[in-house]
């Protein structure tokens, strides 16, 4: 997707110009306020492809990255194989404006960029075109059986999740490096029908470590559910609740008191804030954070966590 604004929907252009025409007014994307009223107070059930979760909702971290190379189509397929509906992944932007999945801001750790482009250090995602990134192997580092697995575009990943009937927790990775990426992501999601839900949080949630980016997403798409990654001081939680529906800390930073304090505050949609924690990969830890009252657990091995959680 190009950075050029030619051909952008009017709602995106209006929002970027800060004459914000709310996304709620876009026909076919979000319901009207009246249409949504009957569901406004309803908290979505924690479900997987296999049925209802018991306890915290489980999210496959970067796909089921314990079983396949992170942030690839193979990882989404692995998550589906574990019966996990919600998939977390990270999105960045190439030099020519394509949205691609990558956790690090450089390509070196999870691709063969150093071999393919030896003179392009430090191999920043933002310095490569989509075509150049498409030449890279994003799977061989994980295992020979994944050699040749490509870096997916966001479009490719959405298509895979659609095929698998999965849902998306999408992290905007270092969005300050990519001005305007929030509107571009929303445009991509809208083009692929991911915002056509009575309550979009039932299918897609956008999160980031950068509060300004989360706020921007909320301003552009106020019905969309958002999350802030981190552990804000309890006294500041009401400020975050103006634009974030989730506060998502590292598991090491959690206490029962902190979780309860977050959940006592209502977010921008009038529902209690939720707490999703990361990255939890063993049963003992999973039960500890579940006992703290978290709403969700993000894991590389969600099936292991699911099997270990006490009923």
Predicted regions: what they are:
Residues 2-17, 21-311:
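Phosphate-group recognition and catalysis centered on beta-loop-alpha active-site segments
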């Amino acid at each position: 997707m190009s950075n050029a604004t030619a051909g952008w929907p009017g709602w995106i252009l209006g929002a970027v110009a800060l004459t914000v025409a709310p996304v709620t007014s876009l026909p076919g994307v979000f319901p009207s306020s009246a249409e949504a009223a009957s569901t406004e107070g309803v908290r979505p059930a924690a479900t997987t492809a296999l049925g209802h979760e018991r306890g915290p909702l489980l999210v496959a971290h970067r796909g089921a990255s314990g079983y396949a190379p992170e942030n690839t189509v193979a990882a989404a397929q692995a998550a589906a194989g574990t019966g996990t509906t919600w998939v977390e992944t990270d999105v960045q932007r190439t030099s020519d404006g394509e949205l691609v999945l990558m956790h690090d801001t450089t390509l070196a750790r999870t691709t063969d960029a150093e071999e393919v482009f030896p003179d392009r250090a430090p191999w920043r995602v933002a310095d490569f075109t989509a075509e150049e990134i498409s030449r890279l192997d994003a799977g061989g580092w994980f295992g020979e059986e994944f050699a040749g697995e490509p870096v997916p575009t966001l479009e490719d990943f959405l298509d895979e999740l659609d095929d698998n009937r999965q849902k998306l927790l999408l992290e905007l990775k270092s969005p300050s490096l990519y001005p305007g990426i929030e509107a571009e992501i929303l445009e991509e999601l809208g083009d692929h029908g991911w915002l056509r839900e009575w309550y979009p949080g039932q299918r897609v949630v956008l999160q980031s470590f950068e509060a300004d980016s989360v706020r921007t997403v909320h301003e552009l798409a106020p019905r969309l559910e958002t999350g802030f990654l981190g552990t804000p001081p309890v006294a500041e939680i009401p400020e975050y609740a103006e634009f974030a529906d989730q506060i998502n800390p590292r598991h090491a930073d959690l206490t029962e008191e902190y979780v309860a304090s977050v959940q006592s505050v209502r977010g921008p949609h009038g529902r209690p804030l939720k707490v999703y924690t990361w990255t939890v990969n063993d049963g003992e830890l999973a039960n500890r954070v579940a006992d703290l009252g978290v709403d969700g657990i993000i894991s590389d091995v969600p099936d292991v966590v699911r099997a270990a959680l006490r009923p």
